[in-house]
Amino acid sequence: MAKIAVFFGGSSTEHSISILTGCFICKTLHTMGHSVKPILLTKDGGWVVPSEYRMSIPFEVSNSPDLFQEEFQKRYGVSRTNQIFSLDADIAFLGLHGGQGEDGTIQGFLEILGIPYTGSGVLASAIAMDKTRANQIFLQSGQKVAPFFEIDKLEYLNSTDAVITKLETLGFPQFLKPVEGGSSVSVYKITNREQLKEKLALIFESDSKVMSQSFLTGIEVSCGVLERYRDGKFKKIALPATEIVPGGEFFDFESKYKQGGSHEITPARISEQEMKRVQELAIAAHRSLGCSGYSRTDFIIVNGEPHILETNTLPGMTETSLIPQQAKAAGISMEEVFSDLIEIGLKRSLY
């Protein structure tokens, strides 16, 4: 059995979801017999690094980030960041979402430390996090995406009217979102010029780049991809896609994570041909971005043709997240999924 450091929390807007992911990962790895060291990255950029491998996680308050951090620090003590430099771990299991956890930053840090980790590497993580760059790669590889524009904050401030006029060519409604972000945080459905101005100004308060994308009507689905090492070869498999029926206008943060916010159906209620096509494209997206270990790609099917919305390199891993749902539908246990992720991470570090 391995000594595994589980990283979760972080300073992104997805901190609370990452805590739930981290708790699920720790609990599962512990039942598998691994030695687990939970490492909490706090919302203000601090680290709580236990001095030893032991499980004393306050699962009972995992739905309350502030209480969780307080109780976690009581149990493990307040640590100094430099403790991470002497981390004794066979591998790091990443349960971070968004921000520096998903944009290649933590991956690069772990590579400097010489610690193998689960999931995609630095470059794939950075590209997938940048929605514009990812869309450009998808287009170059022959995949379909909705028409889009990227707007830089400086460009907007210098030529506001020209920028608004350009974005209006996408038509209404359209989706406005930070170029780097996840879990549909700060994503807005825009229906008119005034709202466009208002939400651009709002996003630019905390982000430097915005992407606006045409609104497509169709069936929303999401498809996970797992990598496995079998018979001396690396293999990629696509899981059964999940159909997303949002409780609101679209699959935003509330729909994703609030109870009753959306209805998720696995496998999706689509034709066998559409399912096969979605799975093929999910693997193609995974390969195009250079992902490793696992990923999850979101699509909207328009008149039978899937269009990529985005690829997530560290998809949610709570007990009710899409990857666990899809693995269950495929007859794959989460213990098996985690074993594969660990094996892929360890083998990748050898090359």
Curated annotation (Swiss-Prot):
Q: Record keywords: Metal-binding included?
A: yes
Q: How is the cofactor bound?
A: Binds 2 magnesium or manganese ions per subunit.
Provide one Gene Ontology biological process annotation: regulation of cell shape
PROSITE patterns, sorted: ATP_GRASP, DALA_DALA_LIGASE_1, DALA_DALA_LIGASE_2
Q: Where in the cell is it found?
A: Cytoplasm
Where it mainly occurs, coarsely classed, is cytoplasm
Q: Which residues bind Mg(2+) 2?
A: E310, N312
ATP-grasp domain: residues covered: 135-343
Please name the GO terms that the record assigns under molecular function: ATP binding; D-alanine-D-alanine ligase activity; metal ion binding
Q: Which residues does Mg(2+) 1 bind?
A: D298, E310
**Could you name the Gene Ontology cellular component terms for this entry?**
cytoplasm
Which EC numbers characterise this protein's activity in its record? 6.3.2.4
Q: Which cofactor does it need?
A: Mg(2+); Mn(2+)
Residues engaged in binding ATP? 167-222
> What top-level class of enzyme does the UniProt entry assign?
ligase
Sorted keywords for this record are: ATP-binding, Cell shape, Cell wall biogenesis/degradation, Cytoplasm, Ligase, Magnesium, Manganese, Metal-binding, Nucleotide-binding, Peptidoglycan synthesis
Q: Show the Gene3D superfamilies listed in the entry.
A: 3.40.50.20, ATP-grasp fold, A domain, ATP-grasp fold, B domain
Which chemical reaction does it catalyze?
2 D-alanine + ATP = D-alanyl-D-alanine + ADP + phosphate + H(+)
Q: What family is reported? A: Belongs to the D-alanine--D-alanine ligase family.
Which NCBIfam families does the UniProt record give?
A: D_ala_D_alaTIGR (TIGR01205), PRK01372.1 (NF002378), PRK01966.1-4 (NF002528), PRK14572.1 (NF011170)
Record-given protein name:
D-alanine--D-alanine ligase
Q: What are the leading ranks of the lineage?
A: Bacteria, Pseudomonadati, Spirochaetota, Spirochaetia, Leptospirales
Chain's gene name:
ddl
